[in-house]
Amino acid sequence: MVSVNLEAKKTVDVMIEKQDELNIAVSQLSNGATIIDCGVNVDGSFKAGELYTKVCLGGLADVGISIPGDLSEKFALPSVKIKTDSPAISTLGSQKAGWSVSVGDFFALGSGPARAICKKPAETYEEIGYEDTEADLAILTLEADVLPGEDVAQYIADECNVDVKDVYLLVAPTSSLVGSIQISGRVVENGTYKMLEAIKFDVTKVKHAAGIAPIAPIDPDGLKAMGKTNDAVLFGGRTYYYVESDENDDIADVAAKLPSSAADGYGKPFFDVFKEAEFDFYKIDKGMFAPAEVVINDLTTGKIYKEGYVNVDLLKKSFGVDN
């Protein structure tokens, strides 16, 4: 079976080779681990955001950036485009922020291929029937405001049972260009996550997927940046899923439940919802983490289902746009 770490390494190699033109910084820790700073002490770039997102997806997706004019006649934003023919593995088996990395004073949400080696969390990999058993290296992306040290790299190496010199850690804060891009790049993953976690649908039946979401404006306030980046998907994300159903599946019901607008807490910017939940993710309805608009093509029946909608008014409210 394909190795998400070995596939992602191809993109990591490009980032290392082109670090200057990408406005990123590559360094090596004293224990040999490689750190790729994509936004902590550097500016990053659009292209760095594309490549970072592709690494998150285990190299199993095409990632691009464009400015579509159809989000709204009066409101166009640079947007991230995702296409994948391995949706379950690329999004849930790699991209999902499923590893809370806590070592000493360092904490970050970990995404990316290394999760598939040590199966974090194990339930996800049981559900999708995947594990990366081929890799002799570990690649993890970290959403953090500071760069990790030797102790963090050693922890990752130990968890993945690889030599620390074969650990690659990519870092971008939420309040950076690359950070904003990679969160919008989770537009497809938000849908597969909700299918699995909230709707309990077998995501291995999703054979192909595509999505697009606007890139949230960069905010130096980390909490506000987190709100805006989530809203980019919740209110502006559009996704397309190609599903191979069986006779027991109610795809119309899956489609109806999938958009963010189907969640109980829908209707406010995410920062407001998060604040009301006392900044505790676990108090927020899981159904909130979903794209705004969903189209499902049932490959078995030929039927197509469209649910949800782009909410430009809430997107503008979140981003602070007055007109």
Swiss-Prot record:
GO molecular-function annotation terms?
methenyltetrahydromethanopterin cyclohydrolase activity
Going by the entry's taxonomy, the superkingdom of the source organism is recorded as: Archaea
Q: Which GO terms describe its cellular component?
A: cytoplasm
| E.C. number | 3.5.4.27
Principal location listed in the UniProt entry: cytoplasm
Family that this chain belongs to: Belongs to the MCH family.
Describe the function of this protein: Catalyzes the reversible interconversion of 5-formyl-H(4)MPT to methenyl-H(4)MPT(+).
UniProt name for this protein: Methenyltetrahydromethanopterin cyclohydrolase
What is the organism of origin for this protein?
Methanobrevibacter smithii (strain ATCC 35061 / DSM 861 / OCM 144 / PS)
Q: What is the lineage of its organism?
A: Archaea, Methanobacteriati, Methanobacteriota, Methanomada group, Methanobacteria
